[in-house]
Amino acid sequence: MAMSVPGGRAVLMMAALVAAAGGPSSVVLGAELAAASRLAAAAATILAGDAGRHVAALADDAFEGREAGSRGGRAAGAYIVEAIDHLGLEPAGDSGGFYQPFGNMRNILALARGSDPTVADELVIVSGHYDHVGYGNASNSYGPFGFVHNGADDNASGVAGLIEIAEALQALPARPRRSILLAFWDGEEKGLLGSYHFLRVRPEPLRNFRIVFCINLDMIGRLRGERVEVYGSRTSPGLRALTVAVNNRAGATALELAYDWKIDPDSDHYAFIERQIPTLMFHTGLHDNYHRPSDDVHLVNLPGLESVARLAFATAIAVADEAAPPRPFREACRRESGSSQRLLEAQAAGGKRGRWGIGTRSDAAEPQAPVVVRVAPDSPAARGGLIVGDRITMIDGVELVDQDNMVQRLGEAGERVTMIVDRRGRLIQIELIDGR
């Protein structure tokens, strides 16, 4: 039968599995668990109530829809600077301040410098745009025009998440190894102007940094069914595995991760992908209030915003603390699309049943997690609860290397096999029994 792997127990179980496989000593595992506990404590400072106050402020009529370059847009920028000014972050804009002006618009940039001198010049960016469409017009609104478009979800929700992440960074007892830049983009609704400007003209405090990763938050305020869309997971090998691992530290509150392969110029993550920088975007989906005056505060799912912001924070820390060199950009992501994804994940026609009743396909970006595309009826796999779309990540406590390794391991197995599978971003334990 299928069984979800609960939160703190998931960490302990994985530690035990690693130790049983001849992995790190109990001292190392104890240190890792202590670090996970400190990270969880910092993430716990990201709170729905605090985020809600920022959403309510930014989506107030007084900001007149936060159009880039407008009076309301500039007032929104001033609000953000006031919210982060006391957090001990370094201003990373021009002239010693947080602002990076361009035209009549302003990005807002705040730096948490890394703790390891050998990699502190490597920059992980966590970003979101703070502008919206003002009163709306035929080019940027679905109407009615002439009314304040408050943009509570788009993107006061993402900005609130960023401010909460800034506070969580200050709650960490020690900074991560790499530096983290919090970037609030202006001009996104006018064509990703702020992120493009930043990539073309780096402010003086950041000119000696190398951007190694970007996480973008856009419209994270309408979580439905615990499902968050994840874009960019194909921009570097193993990004799905990374986000799944981070997500499952939350245990019972782990979100359903809906990975989408498409890459469209619809938010600031696109500018970084164009520059061949590995990038993720978290997004809770479009809705009928998108770019309408009705995108208002009372519709925002604040507990959901809290969950997505905590996931983004923990992902940023995981990347910033990685011992390995920066993740490479995966050029093949540009040639992949929704149809490529459907081809990989499509159910396979019936074939030879085999001992366990499992058919899989290998994923070039995640070879260590073969995709289940066939489960034979009345097979050990079917009886154990394996379903099409699951990704097999571990067999009997040992992580897989690739599909060939999986086939070998299953061929050598006894009458029982315990698997850990990634099911839409949640880790599930499956037990297969060979009833021959």
Task: List PLM regions with ranges.
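Conserved PDZ fold ligand-binding element
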Residues: 381-404
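A non-catalytic alpha/beta surface segment that caps or lines the substrate-entry region
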Residues: 57, 66-113
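PDZ-domain C-terminal substructure recognizer with occasional recognition of PDZ-binding tails
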Residues: 387, 393, 407-436
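His/Asp/Glu-rich mid-to-C-terminal helical/loop segments that flank catalytic regions of hydrolases
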Residues: 171, 288-337
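Metal-dependent peptidase/peptidase-like ectodomains
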Residues: 185-287, 301
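Acidic/His- and Gly-rich active-site-bordering loop/insert found
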Residues: 58, 84, 102-140
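Alpha-helical metal-binding/catalytic segments enriched in His/Glu/Asp
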Residues: 110, 126-128, 132, 137-192, ...
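PDZ/PDZ-like groove recognition
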Residues: 334-388
